[in-house]
Design a protein with these regions (language model features):
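Composition-driven recognition of glycine/serine/threonine/acidic- and proline-rich low-complexity segments
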Residues: 1-177
Length: 177
């Protein structure tokens, strides 16, 4: 599998499960991404605290779909502000074996975004953004983000890794307009 295909695999997995075609993405250089997306996405920080700081509130998780197979846990999610407004649509593949059992349990409960769970439980980790992209939202993405008509959306493919370089999760993150 090519690195690019691997970066998007958490996202593409849900389309494959639904036997649907994923929208075409266009890779872009981080510096060419327009603001405020560049400040939010082109960073080595976790999205959860970055978005919480930007929106001045704690975000909560809405799980739209999940697949748990052994040590791999995939979920399609929204991060919502307190008024239930979506601030991120994402797909994530979590490697449960990289986490302690108590943290695994919190992740599987699906109450908090992964970044929040890692920070709140003092799990040392870092982000490694792999790709930045634009996409014209399809029905699935637009419905999830509350977008009424197709428009250009921006996102990133990111890997969360332990301090020892072991992957915790691969994430595809898309922000609303």
């Amino acid at each position: 599998m090519s690195p690019l295909v691997e970066y998007f695999s958490p996202f593409m997995g849900f389309y494959a499960d639904a036997q649907a075609t994923a929208p075409e993405t266009t890779l872009i250089d981080g510096p060419s991404m327009p603001e405020p997306y560049r400040s939010l996405l082109v960073t080595n920080g976790d999205m959860t605290p970055t978005l919480e700081k930007f929106h001045h509130c704690q975000l909560h998780l809405k799980v739209l779909g999940r697949v748990h197979a052994g040590e791999e846990y995939r979920r399609q999610v929204l991060l919502l502000d307190p008024s239930q407004r979506p601030v991120e649509f994402g797909a994530i593949r979590i490697h449960l074996s990289a986490l302690l059992p108590a943290v695994q349990k919190l992740v599987l409960a699906g109450q908090r975004p992964l970044g929040g769970v890692l920070i709140e439980n003092s799990v040392p980790h870092r982000s490694q953004p792999r790709a930045y992209f634009s996409v014209i939202g399809d029905d699935l993405i637009n419905r999830a983000l509350g977008v009424s008509k197709p428009c250009v959306l921006y996102g990133r493919c990111n890997t969360l890794i332990t301090k020892d370089g072991i992957p915790i999760a691969e994430v595809v993150e898309i922000l609303p307009p």
